[in-house]
Structure formats: C-alpha cells, structure tokens
C-alpha cells in the first residue's frame, strides 16, 4: 500500500526523527513539568536536564566549544598531587598549550557525565567560570548513572517543588526555586582552586579537605574554616568523599582542561 502524505507531514516526522537522539537519556527520557501560573492556568515545560544545550539560556556563552581565548600561561595548571602533597605520575603532567579547551568543552565531550553537564549549562554564573580559561577549577562530575539513581532529580531538591506547586506558587517562584536547586547541586560539585590555599586544607598525609563553591557561598564569614569535599590518593588511585559521611569512591577517570581538572565519579556529593 502506498501512502501519499503531505510534504508538511513528512517534514514533521523527519524533524522528530532527527531530534530524537538529543532527547534520549537512557532512564532520563523527556520529562515535562506541569505547573500553574498565578491565574491557575496549567502549563508544561521540559525538565531542566532535558533542555537542549545552549537553548535554555542563549546568553550563557557565545564562544564556540566554550573557548574564550588563551589562558595566561604564567598561571600554573591545577595539579592534584600538589594539593595532596603526593608524588605525581608522569602521565598526569599537563601542558596547557597542548590542550586549549576549557573545562566546559571537556565536559561536553565526556558522554558519561552529560546529565551533570546539562545542569552546569543551566547555571549561568558557574557555566561562565567553567568556560573561563583563567579560572582554576576542580570539577567532581557524577556519572549519568549516579544522577539517575537519585530518588529526586537535582532540580527537585532541596527546595520542595511539588509542595510549592501544591501551595499555589507562581511561575516565577517555581522558576526561582528550581534554579536555586540546580545551582546548589552544580556548585556542590565544583571547587574554585587558588594557590593561597584558602580553598583547601590538608587533613592527613595524602588527604585534603576542599571547599566547594556552594560551601564558600554558604559560609557566614571569611574566617570560617572547614570544607565539604575530601580528596585523597592511595597508590595511583584518587578517591573522593563528602565530608558528611566520609565514604570514599574511586575516581573513574580524569580529564585535564586549560582551566582545571574533571574527576569523574559514580556517585553524587549531595542528595535529597
């Protein structure tokens, strides 16, 4: 049987077929949030992690591949062994001039952390740091599996979005709460490293306590010490833990960028 479909219909299905890969995230298939505006009218929108990169906020970064110029080579590269006071492996030595891509570009190339990367893109301030070649960052990037296994999606906590909706929150209030949740999740996994050692403290041989962006933003005063992320090295393996439970997880892979390093781990530092 031959179907003579209108050209418009054929184009529609061709477009859907072409877009399909960008909407499939394994367990995280396209999810729609239903909410009411101030007039009680129902709306639907894509969950933040399902929004195609750079479509959620076009002002985030206008540079291709996250490239924002050359790094000041007088700035030393982030070196985990310097932070830990451990012996450096030769294969981890980093030459910035051979790897000009920023961490934002590196994140986009690691398939195993694309859910986390999508959250980073939806936190404008942090995204710009990740894209800046003259920042020095340590990104603890949870795998897609780790994020998918959370009982709530990162945009749903700690602000209780369901409760806000049932209490009649406005669209603006919901957007603000969701953005706060996204920012807190992202910033709980990123450390802004500086060489004056304000961002880390050695707690034992080969083990260092780091301060995430979220931790530093939540501090009541600059004199407050401590941290929320533990990083250690045993033999040739790096491990990461939350300071809350001190349960260490092995770093599965390390990616070096012009402005820091990405440590891929199969767990999240914060949860519902």
Swiss-Prot record:
Domain of life: Eukaryota
Compartments, record wording: Vacuole
Ranges in coiled-coil conformation: none
One GO cellular component term noted in the UniProt record for this chain: fungal-type vacuole
Keyword Nucleus attributed: no
InterPro entries in the record: FAS1_domain, Mug57-like
Keyword Signal: yes
Signal peptide (residue range): 1-26
The FAS1 domain, residue ranges: 100-269
Principal subcellular localization: other
Keywords (A to Z) from UniProt: Signal, Vacuole
Other remarks in the entry: Present with 4846 molecules/cell in log phase SD medium.
Protein name, per record: FAS1 domain-containing protein YDR262W
């Amino acid at each position: 049987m031959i179907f003579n479909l209108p050209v418009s219909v054929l184009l529609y299905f061709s477009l859907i077929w072409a877009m399909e890969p960008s909407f499939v995230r394994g367990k995280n298939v396209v999810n729609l949030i239903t909410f009411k505006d101030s007039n009680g009218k129902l709306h639907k929108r894509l969950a933040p992690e399902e929004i195609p990169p750079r479509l959620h906020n076009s002002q985030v970064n206008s540079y291709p591949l996250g490239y924002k110029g050359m790094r000041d080579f007088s700035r030393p590269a982030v070196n985990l062994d310097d932070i830990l006071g451990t012996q450096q492996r030769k294969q981890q030595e980093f030459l910035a001039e051979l790897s000009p891509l920023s961490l934002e570009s590196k994140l986009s190339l690691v398939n195993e952390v694309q859910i986390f990367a999508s959250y980073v893109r939806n936190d404008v301030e942090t995204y710009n740091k990740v894209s800046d070649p003259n920042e020095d960052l340590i990104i603890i990037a949870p795998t897609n599996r780790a994020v998918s296994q959370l009982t709530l999606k990162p945009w749903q906590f700690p602000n209780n979005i369901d409760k806000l909706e049932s209490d009649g929150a406005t669209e603006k209030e919901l957007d603000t709460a969701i953005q706060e949740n996204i920012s807190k999740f992202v910033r709980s996994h990123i450390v802004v490293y500086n060489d004056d050692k304000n961002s880390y403290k050695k707690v034992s041989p080969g083990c260092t306590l780091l301060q995430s962006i979220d931790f530093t933003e939540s501090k009541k005063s600059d004199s407050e010490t401590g941290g929320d992320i533990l990083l250690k090295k045993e033999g040739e393996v790096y491990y990461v833990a939350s300071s809350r439970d001190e349960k260490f997880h092995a770093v599965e892979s390390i990616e070096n960028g012009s402005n820091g390093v990405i440590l891929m781990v199969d767990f999240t530092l914060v949860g519902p």
